[in-house]
A protein has these predicted regions:
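Class I Rossmann-like S-adenosyl-L-methionine
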Residues: 1-193
Length: 193
């Protein structure tokens, strides 16, 4: 019979989380900032299953410091808000779709993609923390997949940023060419830049 305990890189044995994904009990043993990210993953999974966001937040925030609450709320709300585009970005970096039992991993990768795209967190820190969560939860065989997908997302973001051209003044002031021309004609010395 298969033993549910698995040896980690540090030599300690730990139980794999269920196929449905981690629970609050699974992430309690995770140390420091990784614990915050892992709890946000559990919150996201609960909300996706139909749980009340407010009830889940109240339960999770009992363990958070005020600083962790702000980070967790930004990460959770931003990831949920941008879930579909982030999910598409993650899926572009996968060779084949994840199985239905891997939805928790996809949610974790979406959290990582949100941090890479929208938060001011260094890419190496984001990738390392997401990979460490996978490893700590006992899924050593998925570490390479998580690392590769997040590095792919990082490369796609960098490529998209290189393609961006500087905006003309009428683009970021949300005014037409004609208005900009009139303003420039009448107030030539007052330049907006």
């Amino acid at each position: 019979m298969n033993n549910p305990k698995k040896k980690t890189a540090t030599g300690s044995s730990q139980k794999k989380v269920s196929k449905k994904g981690p629970s609050f009990d699974d992430v309690k043993k995770i140390p420091g900032q990784l614990k915050t990210r892992a709890q946000v993953l559990v919150l996201m999974l609960e909300v996706q299953k139909g749980a009340s966001l407010q009830h889940s937040l109240d339960r999770a925030f009992q363990d958070f410091s005020p600083q962790e609450r702000g980070f967790a709320l930004e990460l959770l709300m931003g990831s949920l808000r941008d879930y579909i585009p982030l999910q598409m970005e993650v899926r572009k970096c996968l060779a084949k779709p994840l199985k239905s039992s891997g939805k928790w991993l996809e949610a974790l990768l979406v959290l990582g993609a949100y941090q890479l795209t929208s938060m001011n967190t260094p890419a190496r820190a984001v990738i390392h923390s997401m990979v460490e969560i996978v490893r700590t939860l006992g899924y050593d065989h998925l570490v390479g997949l998580a690392n590769g997908v997040l590095r792919g997302v990082q490369r796609n973001i960098e490529a998209a940023n290189r393609k961006l051209k500087p905006l003309a003044i009428h683009d970021y002031l949300n005014e037409g060419h004609w208005l900009h021309a009139e303003l420039f004609k009448n107030w030539r010395k007052c330049r907006i830049s």
